[in-house]
């Protein structure tokens, strides 16, 4: 399930950025915007599903000491998903959106950093840190 989660995040971030820049210079969405946005929503559902699955698996074992970090990552992940959607909708409506865009990017970086340092992440595996 971890691979599905990582794959979904990578595709979701790419789709978010492509959807964000798929507007004309006048601010109207291009024809490709709607399919991109719908595909992004599909991947957001996959992200949420696989993330919740991982949290349930981790909490079911109850052997790790990283529950607080995992909960923080879960909250950040839900925030990223919400900010992605709100940013695109506000841009489509012509409202202010640049601050939301950069806030989303910053929260993506924080969430990815938390995912990297948690057990099962690349740094934990590199230094053989177990739960």
Swiss-Prot record:
It holds the Pfam family DUF1516. Its main location: membrane. It comes from the Bacteria. It is found in: Cell membrane. It comes from Staphylococcus carnosus (strain TM300). The chain crosses the membrane at residues 1-21, 42-62, 69-89, 99-119. The lineage of its organism: Bacteria, Bacillati, Bacillota, Bacilli, Bacillales. GO terms for cellular component: plasma membrane. Keywords: Cell membrane, Membrane, Transmembrane, Transmembrane helix. Belongs to the UPF0344 family. This is UPF0344 protein Sca_0577. It is a multi-pass membrane protein. The keyword Transmembrane helix applies. InterPro entries: UPF0344.
